[in-house]
Amino acid sequence: GLEGRQPLLPAEGSALGAVNLAAHLTKGGRLDYKRLARTIHTAVHLLDNAIDVSEYADSRQSRLTRATRRIGIGMMGLAEVLRAKGVSYDSEKARKTAQQLAKVIDEQARLASQRLAGRRGPFPLFTESRQNNGAQRRNSAVTATAPNEVLAAICGVTPGISADCAVSAQACVKMQAAVQRYTEGNVYLPIPAKTREQMQELCTMGYLLGCKSIEADVCEPVEIPDFLKDCQPERETQEIAPEKPQSALRQEMPHFCPACGRALRKRQIVPVCEECGPLMCLQTVENMQ
């Protein structure tokens, strides 16, 4: 994940996932914490494996991601848990419930990462990190709540810690702050802010409560000033050289193999080098036609 749920180094990546809380509800509406702990340990193992088997954009991203081994386990289906308990989303009891769940996820994820480090070793940059004075961990970070709308839709639950009904923006910020206390990375929760002024107030509120980020769900469009509308980049006048006929281009451009330097010969459409074989270069094909 590169969307900012985990603070990352340049070109670094992380593996993110979410635990379906609703799947751990018993028939009586209670949470099965033992089963939840097993799920978290499995998730840590899964995401750590994902770091090794994933394909990356380049060698630098692959090297940095495997050096820190950041993962982010979050939650989804919180609204279903609160509804099963008969608790209103905008209540102190709901925030305490969410905070307790975040604490369990964080503690079990740390424990699972420590056990995994005992078998596989800590992340390569452990001795250079701020965690080198504590217990060895397989992953430099273990918890974060990312936007998991797709996963939630597959599981049939509400995404992340979102409510299943309309609630105030202040209630969302308070809920996010409650979960953020026991989350290493960021906690994603879209805030229904309608104006820029309201968004500024919510950002201040979130900062004072300990949130690491505040993201607006809906905000009024900002009018573009006239001086920006009329601003156009100056175009430099350049003289365009007359195009040369195709026959002249064919005579000027020698057709040699870029690998061994031998002359190319054309076989049907694909140019062929006697030493290296066919060359699938479209530009070379077009020039030889």
Spans of features found by a protein language model:
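Long, C-terminal-biased catalytic regions of enzyme "large/alpha" subunits
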Residues: 1-289
